[in-house]
Amino acid sequence: MFTSEKGVVEEWLSEFKTLPETSLPNYATNLKDKSSLVSSLYKVIQEPQSELLEPVCHQLFEFYRSGEEQLLQFTLQFLPELIWCYLAVSASRNVHSSGCIEALLLGVYNLEIVDKQGHTKVLSFTIPSLSKPSVYHEPSSIGSMALTESALSQHGLSKVVYSGPHPQREMLTAQNRFEVLTFLLLCYNAALTYMPSVSLQSLCQICSRICVCGYPRQHVRKYKGISSRIPVSSGFMVQMLTGIYFAFYNGEWDLAQKALDDIIYRAQLELYPEPLLVANAIKASLPHGPMKSNKEGTRCIQVEITPTSSRISRNAVTSMSIRGHRWKRHGNTELTGQEELMEISEVDEGFYSRAASSTSQSGLSNSSHNCSNKPSIGKNHRRSGGSKTGGKEKETTGESCKDHFARKQTQRAQSENLELLSLKRLTLTTSQSLPKPSSHGLAKTAATVFSKSFEQVSGVTVPHNPSSAVGCGAGTDANRFSACSLQEEKLIYVSERTELPMKHQSGQQRPPSISITLSTD
């Protein structure tokens, strides 16, 4: 230590003793600008045999208990260097030369564990809930927040982490050493934004030295001094990582990178899961290159905020929406029988297009032709009570059949919601699927048409049997378009129909079909 540096420290010691209490705030404001004093104090602390070490430690303790915030921060900036000097002296078993440093650390610890009234202080931290917004994330919108029993039971519940109460210590031993030092690093990390760059550099350097001393990496780092291993605890290493993470984004990239690697190295040797988890998380979140930082501006850790857009579609298909759609559809009495037939044909077209998409267009044209040419095939099978209404409906069937098909096909191509609704109509309950005793012909027809449809898809040629299917012709209806969505058990009847001979008979086969007539009875 040079004479000039020693003179600066001695002047600083004498100045504070003669300082009146009224001028203490101005003195604290001007103290942080004295860079030469700070560097001289670091050199005094690094020399355990210096005669100025004891008065310097006493002066720093007076600063800390003065109650002035800036004087407290001035003392805290030397805390990493003080911890390193204490651990180095303890490892060399030269306890007598570290008495003043130990007294300063104990004094700061005992002041921090109590509040201004002298009561034991309990520090708490509330872990943020993912269901509530924070500076780190925006919860996704899930629609209306229903007050269910589960939601009410969890309302207001959040996990809180407590630190304390901490007992007072009169001396540092091997049992309580890292409990005290971990708490002191916690206090230092709470004031990281007020620490100068020289303090962050000291933090990174002492973290590297503590982790590699006594291990082969010490020769790689070329650290001189003690060569014995310094024991550390898992919580102490986590607190070191907190300060290093801050140093990454505040102008000390290289030193912080070296310290992070050394902490991972030591945590792997000690098999500490907590520092390994935190260190690897920090390493994975770092950018590829150093961050530019304005050392004179506000210090902060950059975080990425998630977008506020909704992540769940408001048109999502749920069991409630399907049930509501089914009720609405069953309660609508304004639909005519032909409109219901168009909807069933549309659903069946979607089913058959998955099996053989190449024949779907021909099936549509054939169904349209059948609807326009034979509007009154199933009239004999209608109930007497609904004959008048059925006659009026069949008079308008031939005119609106093609219009219905064109409108349905256009709507299905333009909107994805129609496809979802079509899939919903394929869902039949057990009660709707079972036929009534009076409708054995309908069940027989449906089974025959299904078997013929799948035989056509698989490419197997089956000789036509007129007696095995109801409503199928003798020569031209082997591949008719099938209508398999039978959803209204009271409105569906089977009517036999004959196929008029086509003028242009082609070799292309058409999908099998059945004729369905609906009644509003």
UniProtKB/Swiss-Prot annotation:
Its main location: cytoplasm. Widely expressed. Highest levels in heart, brain, placenta, spleen and testis. It comes from the Eukaryota. One of its GO terms (cellular component) is plasma membrane. Residues 390-406 have a biased composition (Basic and acidic residues). Changing C57R: In HLD5; induces misfolding and degradation, leading to destabilization of the PI4K complex. It holds the Pfam family Hyccin. Keywords: Cataract, Cell membrane, Cytoplasm, Disease variant, Leukodystrophy, Membrane, Phosphoprotein. Induction: Down-regulated by beta-catenin. Residues 355-413, 501-521 are annotated as: Disordered. Residues 355-373 have a biased composition (Low complexity). The modification Phosphothreonine is found at T306. Coiled coil: none annotated. It is found in: Cytoplasm, Cytosol; Cell membrane. The modification Phosphoserine is found at S321, S415, S422, S433, S453. Belongs to the Hyccin family. Component of a phosphatidylinositol 4-kinase (PI4K) complex, composed of PI4KA, EFR3 (EFR3A or EFR3B), TTC7 (TTC7A or TTC7B) and HYCC (HYCC1 or HYCC2). Interacts with TTC7 (TTC7A or TTC7B), interaction is direct. Component of a complex required to localize phosphatidylinositol 4-kinase (PI4K) to the plasma membrane. The complex acts as a regulator of phosphatidylinositol 4-phosphate (PtdIns(4)P) synthesis. HYCC1 plays a key role in oligodendrocytes formation, a cell type with expanded plasma membrane that requires generation of PtdIns(4)P. Its role in oligodendrocytes formation probably explains its importance in myelination of the central and peripheral nervous system. May also have a role in the beta-catenin/Lef signaling pathway. This is Hyccin. It comes from Homo sapiens.
